[in-house]
Amino acid sequence: MTKVVVTGAAGRMGTQIVRLVRATPGLSVSGAVERAGSPAIGKDAGTLAGGEPLGVAVVDDLAKALPGADVVIDFTSHEASVRHAQACAAAGVALVIGSTGFTPDAKAKVAEAARKVPVVLSPNMSVGVNVVFELVRQAARVLGDAYDVEVVEIHHKHKRDAPSGTAVRLGEVAAEALGRAPADALAYSRHGILGERPPWQIGIQTLRGGDVVGEHTVFFCGEGERVEITHRATSREQFARGAARAAAWLPGKAPGVYDMADVLGLRGGK
């Protein structure tokens, strides 16, 4: 039985993950963590998730939940995820990160922790989205430079980071498939008189509103035709399901940074 610690256990994603982990054969919830001062501290993680008690009380420090654990599932913030990665590295516990908004410095700190333990770091745990990454890669290779690439994403009004990590990754996948450096190709906003669109540019546009769980569309715009690849999330459950799948796959792997393509076997694993 793989023992799983869930951070942000009282949040929207955390409660979904607790429910999915307890329902997944071979996985069990061994710990639950919330921020210091949260009213969830001391409460049962199973009850908070709307189910039967698990006998697992929510604590305010990840280090308290790590003894005996096999893997941590973390959907918090990139700042908290860095601290959690460092704690997991010190304790020798594998880590699945679904947080977004990572800066290059934060990613570097996670990579440093991954020198000691295996880490799955993915901007989107959905199986469908990770299939879309591969579809975009293939489309970009086939369509080539004759098609302009644009990415549009929309999320609920409460999402704090923009653009989404998934949108950025979609742009990166297209850029890499076209032989372009993402740092040079990706354009995150347009305003004013900019002149003609540079042919090497990949635009990423952000919309926020209502209760939209998440929607991403990649446009390949050519002369006389347009190809669109879209993923629409209608529930957070598919993110939790992917995270549980990653948690079952990760323990026992060599230290390093993995992503959902590795988990799903979409390319040769490490």
UniProtKB/Swiss-Prot annotation:
It holds the Pfam family DapB_N. Its EC number is 1.17.1.8. NAD(+) binds at residues 8-13, 34, 98-100, 122-125. It is found in: Cytoplasm. Pathway: Amino-acid biosynthesis; L-lysine biosynthesis via DAP pathway; (S)-tetrahydrodipicolinate from L-aspartate: step 4/4. GO terms for molecular function: 4-hydroxy-tetrahydrodipicolinate reductase; NAD binding; NADP binding; oxidoreductase activity, acting on CH or CH2 groups, NAD or NADP as acceptor. (S)-2,3,4,5-tetrahydrodipicolinate binds at residues 156, 165-166. It is an enzyme of class 1 (oxidoreductase). Keywords: Amino-acid biosynthesis, Cytoplasm, Diaminopimelate biosynthesis, Lysine biosynthesis, NAD, NADP, Oxidoreductase. Gene3D superfamilies: Dihydrodipicolinate Reductase, domain 2, NAD(P)-binding Rossmann-like Domain. Its main location: cytoplasm. NADP(+) binds at residue 35. The active site is at 155 (proton donor/acceptor), 159 (proton donor). One of its GO terms (biological process) is lysine biosynthetic process via diaminopimelate. GO terms for cellular component: cytosol. InterPro entries: DapB_C, DapB_N, DapB_N_CS, DHDPR_bac, NAD(P)-bd_dom_sf. It catalyses: (S)-2,3,4,5-tetrahydrodipicolinate + NAD(+) + H2O = (2S,4S)-4-hydroxy-2,3,4,5-tetrahydrodipicolinate + NADH + H(+); (S)-2,3,4,5-tetrahydrodipicolinate + NADP(+) + H2O = (2S,4S)-4-hydroxy-2,3,4,5-tetrahydrodipicolinate + NADPH + H(+). Catalyzes the conversion of 4-hydroxy-tetrahydrodipicolinate (HTPA) to tetrahydrodipicolinate. Belongs to the DapB family. HAMAP family: DapB (MF_00102). This is 4-hydroxy-tetrahydrodipicolinate reductase. It comes from Anaeromyxobacter dehalogenans (strain 2CP-C).
